[in-house]
Amino acid sequence: VEREVIISAGAFNTPQFLMLSGIGPRDELEKHHIETKVNLPGVGKNLQDRYEVGIVSKLKENIPLIKGMKLRPPEAGEEADPQFSLWLQGEGPYTTNGATVALIKRSKPDLPDPDLLIFGLLGNFRGYYPTYSQDIGKEENIFTWAILKAHTNNTNGCVKLRSSDPCDTPDINFHYFFEGANTEDDLESVINGVETVRRIIDRCGDLIEKEIYPGEAIKNREDIRSFVMNQAWGHHASCTCKMGPSSDLMSVVDNRFRVHGTKNLRIVDASIFPKIPGFFIVSAVYMISEKASDDIIEDAMQDDL
């Protein structure tokens, strides 16, 4: 390698690439008959994410701002979405991120920082699955409260190899609400978030016809607990190649993003966080990318001297 190889494949594929190249936990590599080049036990460990759930309600009538919105391209012969022409002029709801209201709060009053982001979305959003983007706008008069739990405690997720075939997907296990991982507080916080949303809905008067998800069958706190444990999702996977000193056996990169025990190899993506940051990780990813670019340029200039 004339300069460097920089891996930016994300929390799932970055550890997969390393392990396929012989960099990772020795026992995991031997299981797939991969020669160990660098024994780094932390590769693929420490997988973290948020906990999120959605509470979906049917409105008695559509919000005037979104009247006629289809949230999808029109079908053949169908009337065009009136909000699309507004978007072309830089106006209307399509110029926003789709959230109409947001609330940041502490799930418990004794917490040092807010840990819940509760925001209202247009459409039917119950999480991420293959057809979720089509389902969001299938019905009119639907409103979703999304609840996101930040500062999660679970660090027990992991990414492993299914095989030595680079075309095979990695084995990903978040170990959501893993017993013994101090995640009971996380679960209680999400439950508190659901109860907060229901109190908000109760105060909306004639706007809401009924809650359709999880619905009337989910009544008490134990019902909510089961709902959250079965339905929570996340989309901020990170921390599988964490940054730390070489004395930390579970760290993978140093403070300049260089992979321990290697030369000319760096990782620059969300996998390097030791702990998942903030509410949304995108700003933190921008920040580490800026730092990495400075480090790479600085090191390259020194090498050229």
Protein language model regions, located:
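Core beta-strand elements of the Rossmann-like FAD/NAD(P) dinucleotide-binding domain
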Residues: 1-4, 8
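Active-site rim elements
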Residues: 3, 40-41, 85-94, 145-147, ...
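Mid-to-C-terminal "cap/lid" subdomains and adjacent gly/pro-rich loops that border
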Residues: 15, 25-139, 188, 192-207, ...
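C-terminal segments that line or cap access tunnels to active or ligand-binding sites in enzymes
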Residues: 104, 126, 142-209
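A glycine-rich dinucleotide-binding beta-alpha-beta segment and adjacent secondary-structure elements
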Residues: 119-121, 129, 140-146, 205-276
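A conserved FAD-binding loop/helix module that cradles the flavin
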Residues: 275-296
